[in-house]
A protein has these predicted regions:
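Short conserved active-site loop signatures built around small residues
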Residues: 1-29
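Well-ordered alpha/beta subsegment
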Residues: 69-70, 95, 129-133
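Glycine- and other small-residue-rich loops at beta-strand/loop junctions that grip anionic moieties
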Residues: 75, 99-100, 121-124, 151, ...
Length: 159
């Protein structure tokens, strides 16, 4: 549920979090990678690996969720990790529309996926709404990827 507090108040108070053990007002940083494993190999604490389940992220994700009024938020170690997560939701044959000017690594990756038949891909000129409309394939277009400002040109797409 979105907070009624001003975003400045929310960020200054970090959701009013207080460490129950130390009474610290700022969440601790957890640099550890491994978590305890039980004799049967399970993870009794529920976390398996810090790269994707770091408790350091919990408060920041909760705060961003409140600030954006969303259902949830996720932090990633890089933009490419975030992009890969989005593209991983696609099924074989799904259609993707992406801008002609975009981060080169994502562009190369999308071309690779398309060349192997994993996705159908159309690139359109950044900000060209008519080209975007023309590229839409009802029933198969599952993702329209917009990068603004575009890397490396800083072209702006009005979203």
């Amino acid at each position: 549920m979105p907070s009624k507090l001003n975003p400045s108040t929310l960020t200054a108070q970090a959701l009013g979090w207080v460490d129950p053990n130390t009474r610290a007002l700022v969440p601790p940083i957890h640099p550890s990678v491994p978590y305890e494993r039980a004799p049967d190999g399970s993870y009794p604490g529920g976390r398996t690996y810090t790269r994707d389940q770091n408790p350091t992220y919990d408060q920041a994700e909760a705060l961003i969720t409140q600030l954006e009024g969303g259902a949830a938020a996720r932090l990633f170690s890089s933009g490419m990790a975030a992009a890969a997560t989005v593209f991983d939701t696609l099924s074989v044959g799904d259609h993707v529309i992406a801008p002609e000017e975009m981060y080169w690594t994502i562009r190369r990756w999308l071309h690779d996926l398309a060349s192997r038949g994993k996705i159908a891909l159309d690139l359109v000129a950044n900000g060209d709404l008519d080209a975007l409309r023309s590229a839409l394939r009802p029933g198969t277009t599952k993702l329209v990827w917009i990068e603004t400002p575009a890397n490396p040109t800083c072209a702006i797409t009005d979203i």
